[in-house]
Regions:
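Alpha-helical transmembrane segments of multi-pass membrane proteins
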Residues: 2-261
């Protein structure tokens, strides 16, 4: 009897991807609602906002706000690359070591984003227009989203996407699902297309669900509505560290057996 293939979507790599998509949807909608339509994970939208403002002849902080977000994002990317070069000899003890470290950093960043954001919201710092005083909050949010996108890009799901939801994801999902109907290819290729299409569909569902739930909660709790996302992130982080530890233990047991022989 032929064994059925294990469900691809239950691997820890996919769990991280879907959790990051859900959390990313929540953070994006909060930034859109409270940070003057700044989508801190989508640089193209900020670039368009900035260009449109400049085209209308406005050259104040408001016009620089969205362009500044793009510039800060590029600086974060540059710093990350410099760190990669500096610590090129860093050896990951397991395949999940880097993910666990990145997720842990993001726990602190998200907690800081929530607390500082709620303080600014209740104290009146977040007024009707953006001011330089909100820059620290923007930087924290951008750092969080950069790591989130990095986790999705390098999360090991073998599907070509760099963020939770970009235009490419919609195209890849649709073409993969439609390709399943192509009987000119083998059954295994059709199944692979179906799995890929369902993966992208799950990414979109998780992102949309996170954004919808957070948008509903935000009218009552403000930035505190992201505590749901923080709890999920902590759970995913702990699970990743546990997986890392189990892998280490199994590796050490194998080494002990080899030495005993």
């Amino acid at each position: 009897m032929k064994k059925s293939a294990p469900c691809t979507f239950t691997s820890i790599n996919h769990q991280i991807h879907y959790a990051m998509s859900f959390i990313g949807g929540g953070v994006e909608v909060i930034s859109f609602i409270f940070l003057f339509k700044a989508l801190i994970g989508f640089m193209t939208s900020n670039l368009i906002f900035g260009i449109n403002t400049f085209a209308n002849g406005k050259f104040d902080y408001i016009s620089l706000y969205h362009i500044g977000i793009v510039v800060i994002w590029m600086l974060i990317a540059a710093i990350h690359q410099l760190c990669m070069i500096k610590f090129t000899n860093f050896r990951k003890r397991t395949p999940w070591h880097g993910y666990a470290i990145s997720l842990t950093i993001n726990c602190f960043l998200l907690a800081s984003f929530i607390l500082i954001g709620q303080y600014m919201l209740t104290s009146g710092v977040l007024g009707s227009l953006p001011t330089p005083s909100i820059t620290p909050l923007i930087i924290i949010g951008l750092m969080f989203m950069y790591i989130q996108n990095y986790l999705i890009k390098s999360g090991g799901t073998n599907y070509p996407t760099t963020t939770s939801v970009v235009t490419t994801v919609y195209v890849l999902m649709t073409t993969s699902l439609v390709n399943y109907l192509n009987h000119n290819i083998s059954k295994s290729e059709r199944q692979a297309s179906l799995r890929e299409g369902l993966h992208y569909l799950l990414v979109l569902i998780h992102f949309s669900a996170g954004a919808y739930i957070t948008a509903k909660l935000s009218s009552h709790f403000g930035f505190y509505s992201l505590f749901l996302m923080l709890f999920i992130l902590i759970a995913v982080t702990m699970n990743t560290w546990f997986t890392h530890s189990r892998f280490l233990c199994s590796s050490s047991d194998e080494n002990s057996n080899d030495k005993a022989i």
